[in-house]
Amino acid sequence: MSETTLLDIQSDYIFKRVFGVEKNKKLLISLINSILKCNPTVTDLEIRNTEISKIVKNNLTIYLDIKAEINPQEFVDIEIQVRNTGEIMERAVQYLAEILTLNCRKLTEKEKEAGQRQTYKYPKVIGIWIMGENVTDRKDAVNEACVAFPPTERDKYQIITDKLRIFFVELQKFHPKHIDRKNMLDVWMAFLKNPLNDDIQDVPEVKEALDTLKEISADKDEREIYYLRQHTEFGYISEKNVAVAQALEKGKKLEREKAKAEKVESAKKMLSKGLSIEDISDFTGLSLEEVKKL
């Protein structure tokens, strides 16, 4: 299969079909461990949302993430996006808060069912955002954000809680001269940028991921879903750009109307003080006809 026939691994649909399926669970574990730097070390996980084909066909506007439980009371949510569509930081926090709240309720309900004393159990939630475009000003390709007190003159930097952690992986910032095949973070970022990168083809995990990608790319139904998904994503971005342009134009129109109203008000004051129509036109920029109508 030639390179041109491979579907884009950075598509959220294709990414999930490669990494978010049970048969490739060990690939997902490898990817997560490489990003988390084995803190914690994931040895097994349960993928929580594997069903996607029906969802994608019925609702093409959804975001296809991978949700997994990596340890008891510890969850990971992985998102991949080709483009920076804006407000990524806010959405990342929102998604993690929703996962934390949902699983907090589930843990509390389990205690209730077991007849135990009900207490709020807060799970740990880790968000991983793999971005095709840059979203931070940080120099490194992988950065972790957490909830913390910033340093002051009297206090040091202090992490408030380890319950919420967010990792941003910015593929545009990854351009090493040499890929260390023993460093799986390098390997996976290279794969996500170019699955056919010659430097990583002898890595067993890459071979397995690439075989899956080739199978998906050769499947007629999978390609149909992929192109439908791409069409919808591009349509969404275009609609968003149009909406932004319309909002900007509306803002400019309001500014023009406000400026015109201020000129009219100034012209009326000048008329009341006996200034000539010609002078008022010169001072305000209003035409002679506009001044005469006041």
Question: Where do the protein language model's features map onto the residues?
Answer:
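Low-complexity, glycine/alanine/valine/leucine- and proline-rich hydrophobic stretches
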Residues: 153-167, 183-195
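Accessory alpha/beta interaction modules
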Residues: 1-165, 175, 246
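Short, charged alpha-helical interaction segments and adjacent helix-coil junctions
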Residues: 2-4, 67-72, 76-81, 179-182, ...
